Amino acid sequence: MSAFKPLVFSGVQPTGNLHLGNYLGAIKKFVALQETSDCIYCVVDLHSLTAQLVHEDLADQTRSITAAFLASGIDPKKHIVFNQSRVMQHAELAWIFNCVARIGWMNKMTQFKDKAGKDRENASLGLLAYPSLMAADILLYRATHVPVGEDQKQHLELTRDIAQKFNNDFSDRIARLGVGVEMQVGEETVNGFFPITEPVIGGPAARIMSLRDGSKKMSKSDPSDLSRINLTDDADTISKKIRKAKTDPEALPSEVSGLESRPEAENLVGIYAGLAEMSKADVLKEFGGQQFSVFKPALADLAVEKLAPIAGEMRRIEGDRAYVDAVLRDGGERAGVLAETTMKTVRDIIGLLQG
């Protein structure tokens, strides 16, 4: 077992409105984790520059994500909520990790291939190095656990590789300075400065698909607003989008295996499961054999019950810009203290001249 103090870190990019997929796949999990763990939740505004350098409303989008965190129930007094660019040590450690990571590792990242597409030569260096910054975000606070979606699992594996390589490359200095922590890596007990961070994955609705196409992930970039439920949608809009969600003509099955090859049905059952905190199997025990004309109204009622209060609270919080800025400022100051403590030791381990 790791001797590191358990700590959860996760971040969300401030690019576009948050939607149901973000809520069930990430934010709802953030809220649950804060009951059992110390947590740091970050609006990763520097990451948003990797795909698009010029933004018209980056500051307002940062406030909007923060408002969503707070409206969903994240407590900024018990935990830390801040935006990444307030803490300069993220960029400092990312540069060091650029020197630890291997180009071959980066070239294997499927998300870079997907986002760069066929025009890789015109992709930004920041997009290629995105996983190094993500590793720095996590390891700057020596976080032991990170809630991640399936699309970020590979990046977290790279974070673990970077931590292990740093620990191995500087093992003698870490031991000499007495800053190592004994931990279990596989079957081996090792001494390292950075933890080998564990993913927190899963839940019945970890991956939410488009309401218009069950084969595509729900996305804020989809041109059809009917494809997603935004966290800012009011009750009437939520109900309308669920009523119009694409389905097939068959009744719901009684077993989860019956959802195979029925992506839209599986998606709606998954949404119900995530909102109700049930398994898909339990949802089908209740609704198996019934038509979507029965299931959709029940899902709409549940979604309105769970999501409409968040939308209302988001609007209230976004209207108090001074409060949102104060939360981010306070969180940034607290995060900065932790970050500088880590970086002082990292500089000593590397041998950079300080003071």
From Swiss-Prot:
The keyword Thylakoid does not apply. L-tryptophan binds at D137. A motif ('HIGH' region) lies at residues 14-22. It catalyses: tRNA(Trp) + L-tryptophan + ATP = L-tryptophyl-tRNA(Trp) + AMP + diphosphate + H(+). CDD domains: TrpRS_core. A motif ('KMSKS' region) lies at residues 217-221. GO terms for biological process: tryptophanyl-tRNA aminoacylation. Disulfide bonds: none annotated. It is found in: Cytoplasm. Catalyzes the attachment of tryptophan to tRNA(Trp). This is Tryptophan--tRNA ligase. The lineage of its organism: Bacteria, Pseudomonadati, Pseudomonadota, Alphaproteobacteria, Hyphomicrobiales.
